[in-house]
Amino acid sequence: TLDDVKALPMDAIFFMEYMKKRGYDVVFHGEYTPDFIPKYTPILLRMGVECVYTPQRQVWKYLEQYGYSFDYLFVSRVYQAQCFDRLFRKYCRRAVYIFNTVDIHFVREELEAQIFNSSLRLSNAMQTKRVELLIASQADATIVISRDEKKLLEETYGLKRIMHIPQARTVRGRSGTWEERK
């Protein structure tokens, strides 16, 4: 278990632990955190996750060398997927592509545009929508965290292979069972 993961996305940790427990080799690289982060990279390394970080390794060189061996690609968030899409298509052609939306970003961005009455935000939301729907349509599986998101993607946009997996959380430090706490 992890004691200090407040800044790491809990669903990412959950999925990495899940895959490790089932015998998969897990490789992590973050678009926004490509460097060794002293507070968090050692946590992933202790879990047995291989971390690709600069300056030791550049992700494109890593994928060029090892991408052919990947069975699965598990990518979280539209901006990560967009950032790495060309590399995956070039170097990881045989891998099953799993896109974890975390949340459907364009819906949140459209709402923000309405709240702030911003045409610029709306334009950005439309671009995010185009990219997010394209990635979800091309993925072998797309994960959403709510039934409403699943319904939206399937019924409004006609997407297939949408999997509803609610966010998993380990509750640490519970003081007794539900009955004892009531």
Residue positions per predicted region:
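Conserved donor-binding/catalytic core segment of Leloir-type glycosyltransferases
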Residues: T1, I143, V171, W178-K182
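N-terminal subdomain of nucleotide-sugar transferases
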Residues: T1-D35, T41-P42
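Conserved nucleotide-cofactor-binding alpha/beta core module
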Residues: V26-Y68
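Short N-terminal targeting/anchoring amphipathic segment
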Residues: E64-C83, V96-I98
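Helix N-cap/beta->alpha junction signal
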Residues: R77, T101-D103, S146-D148
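A short helix->loop->beta-strand "cap" motif at the edges of active sites that frequently abuts
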Residues: Y91-Y97, L159-K160
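Acceptor-binding helix/loop patch of EC 2.4 sugar-transfer enzymes
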Residues: R94-A95, F99-Q127
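Donor nucleotide-sugar binding/catalytic pocket of nucleotide-sugar-dependent glycosyltransferases
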Residues: L133, S137-E154, G158-R174
